[in-house]
Amino acid sequence: MLTTRDIETDEDFAQLAALPGIAGVGAVNRILLPMKLRSAQELREAAAQLRGDIVLLYTLDTQFHTESKLVAPLKAVTLGVFASEKSRIVTTCAAAFIDVRTGFVYGVAEGTATEARRSSPWKTEAAIDAARLKTEREAFSGALKEIAKAWTSINAEYNRTTAALR
């Protein structure tokens, strides 16, 4: 589900569409989703409305750390307190290929990125947000490489199986 496209590019979607065995790639938008999304089942139902067979579900988990502790929720004021400490932003993008009809998980992929520096450059919320977006983009790019590998394996296994049934 893309409610806001912060890190995804048209090139990313073109890369996914070019994978073997992919007939088309589309994003599920908010119109197809309930007001309060509660489960992967609801995402699968939305993908089914678009006649999708497999949904690539991914999530971004971003955490902010200083040398002494995990900081959340992150604000410029919070990092300003730790100006002499080294801070890290760590983002992991986890993805799963899920059968729209059955919920079967065909495979998973993951990418992680880290940005580390002294806290003092992250004094404004805009600077913190820019660093967050950078790590999220890098994690997503890393996950895309793993997604391509996983999909190639999934496609090879299941296309062989369905071809044998014909």
Set out the residue ranges of the language-model regions.
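A structural "domain/chain start" motif
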Residues: 1-26, 153-166
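A composition-biased, non-transmembrane "mature-region" signal
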Residues: 25-29, 35, 109
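Structured segments of extracytoplasmic/periplasmic soluble domains
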Residues: 15-22, 46-53, 61, 142, ...
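Second-shell loop/turn segments in exported
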Residues: 1-3, 29-34, 43-46, 125-136
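Stable alpha-helical elements in mature extracytoplasmic
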Residues: 8-12, 39-43, 139, 143, ...
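C-terminal/domain-edge helix-coil "capping" segments
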Residues: 83-92, 98-166
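Surface-exposed short loop/turn segments
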Residues: 37-101
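Solvent-exposed loop/turn segments at secondary-structure junctions
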Residues: 32-34, 61-66, 114-118
